[in-house]
UniProtKB/Swiss-Prot annotation:
Species, as recorded: Methylorubrum extorquens (strain CM4 / NCIMB 13688) (Methylobacterium extorquens)
SUPFAM superfamilies, alphabetized: Enolase C-terminal domain-like, Enolase N-terminal domain-like
NCBIfam families: eno (TIGR01060)
A molecular-function term among this protein's GO annotations: phosphopyruvate hydratase activity
Record keyword DNA repair present: no
UniProt pathway: Carbohydrate degradation; glycolysis; pyruvate from D-glyceraldehyde 3-phosphate: step 4/5
Entry GO terms, CC: cell surface; extracellular region; phosphopyruvate hydratase complex
Pfam families xrefs: Enolase_C, Enolase_N
E.C. numbers: 4.2.1.11
Name listed for the protein in its UniProt record: Enolase
Record key words, sorted: Cytoplasm, Glycolysis, Lyase, Magnesium, Metal-binding, Secreted
Chain residues that bind Mg(2+): D242, E285, D312
Gene3D superfamilies given in the database record: Enolase-like C-terminal domain, Enolase-like, N-terminal domain
Catalytic activity as recorded in UniProt: (2R)-2-phosphoglycerate = phosphoenolpyruvate + H2O
Gene name of this polypeptide: eno
Length: 429
């Protein structure tokens, strides 16, 4: 009844107008699953490979027809007839078929699209929402959103070197309340930027991209907006940064081209530590470059007891790199992006490894997104307690928030908002 009978794939467009892969899976009993694959702008060197056509006559070489063809030929031949309820077997069959350590032959975009669509079809067969199918009865924790309200770095055309400045409504009473708080801060910030003569254009993830000279200038605007919206920084709302430091780490130093500064590894650690002393920053993602393990260790030893240090490019949702981090006491949290590793099974394994080691996990979107809201379900299924899915603008971001609102409603009295407990360094205060 749950055998895979057909798989179709197509080239659709993501939120940046670039092609991506969408996959449909049909089961013997008529159940259907559809998934669209996201894409990143600042990508880690150790991520699974996103297969692009390289044909400059189509989409400037960014077409994904090769990945689409892989789904409808080799992958269909390999997993057609398999039981959709055996997710591990399906994913392992595709990984073995690819035969490379980073999914370079078939493409992580092809394999992931099928993996997620299979899970959705199996959930439909079971008559369950995806979060319940994947997470079982324990999946009931609604995550605290990391809301990206100021964009810089690779996500915006402005001088700010850090990529994201986020607010986390830890003092909200529910997910719906957290979304309301974030929206009110977002609109208050828009008014403050306008009043100060800044543009209110938004970046890839829906945050504003003002022409500000430094991280401190951006943080000051965010703090002002939290207060003006009627909330208390550090209590109702805490701050989070994504430095995306790999993007400006060159020749052994951190080169802030927008600010005109160069910082050594030790100076970078000092700078981040000082920011956390001056502002209620409880989470820093990619504060050091992806292969600067020594710098990461320095940062962890310096502020890891009081700040969540999230490895994105450092870990790339990969259990081998995460295991090294756990063994060496490097970072204390992992950012989870399904397309960094390329299958649902491997994604869940990374979350499980992190949680068993006492690391937190943050479910995340990519800068190139679609209306697919799978990560909202996965955040609840894994009880990870945190989700990073952009700002309160752009429907590709709001699709995830709206799905979380629906999930919270569906859970009813069982729903539990993570709140302050989501960040261990905050929960103990």
């Amino acid at each position: 009844m749950t055998a895979i009978t057909n798989i179709a794939a197509r080239e659709i467009l993501d939120s940046r107008g670039n092609p991506t892969v969408e996959v449909d899976v049909l089961l013997e009993d008529g159940s259907f699953g559809r998934a669209a694959v996201p894409s990143g702008a600042s990508t880690g060197a150790h991520e699974a490979v996103e297969l692009r056509d390289g044909d400059k006559s189509r989409y400037n070489g960014k077409g994904v027809l090769k990945a689409v063809d892989a789904v409808q030929s080799e992958i269909l031949d390999a997993i057609g007839g398999m039981d959709a309820e055996d997710q591990v077997a399906v994913d392992e069959a595709m990984i073995a078929l690819d035969g490379t350590p980073n999914k370079a032959r078939l493409g992580a975009n092809a394999i992931l699209g099928v993996s997620l669509a299979v899970a959705k079809a199996a959930a439909e067969t079971a008559g369950l929402p995806l979060y319940r199918y994947v997470g079982g009865v324990q999946g009931r924790v609604l995550p605290v959103p990391m809301m990206n309200i100021v964009n810089g770095g690779a996500h915006a055309d402005n001088p700010i070197d850090f990529q994201e400045f986020m607010v986390m409504p830890v003092g909200a009473t529910s997910l719906s309340d957290a979304v309301r708080m974030g929206a009110e801060i977002f609109h208050t910030l828009k008014s403050a930027l306008k009043k100060a003569g800044h543009n209110t254009n938004v970046g890839d993830e829906g945050g504003f991209a003002p022409n500000l000279p430094s991280a401190e200038a951006a943080l000051d605007f965010v703090m002002e907006s939290i207060n003006a919206a009627g909330f208390k920084p550090g209590s109702d709302v805490v701050l989070a940064l994504d430095c995306a430091a790999t993007e400006f780490f060159k020749d052994g130093a951190y080169r802030y081209e927008g600010e005109g500064q160069t910082r050594s590894i030790e100076q970078q650690v000092d700078y981040l530590a000082k920011l956390t002393e001056a502002y209620p920053i409880l989470s820093i993602e990619d504060g050091m470059s992806e292969d600067d393990w020594d710098g990461w260790k320095l940062l962890t030893d310096r502020i890891g007891s009081r700040v969540q240090l999230v490895g994105d490019d450092l870990f790339v949702t990969n259990v081998e790199r995460l295991a090294r981090g756990i063994e060496t006491g490097t970072a204390n949290s992992i950012l989870v992006k399904v397309n960094q590793i390329g299958s649902l099974t491997e994604t869940l394994a990374a979350v499980d490894m992190a949680q068993r080691a006492g690391y937190t996990a943050v479910m995340s979107h990519r800068s190139g997104e679609t209306e697919d809201s799978t990560i909202a379900d996965l955040a609840v299924a894994t009880n990870c307690g945190q989700i990073k899915t952009g700002s309160l603008a752009r429907s590709d971001r709001l699709a995830k928030y709206n799905q979380l609102i629906r999930i919270e409603e569906g859970l009813g009295a069982q729903a539990l908002y993570a709140g302050r407990s989501a960040i261990r360094q905050l929960a103990g205060r």
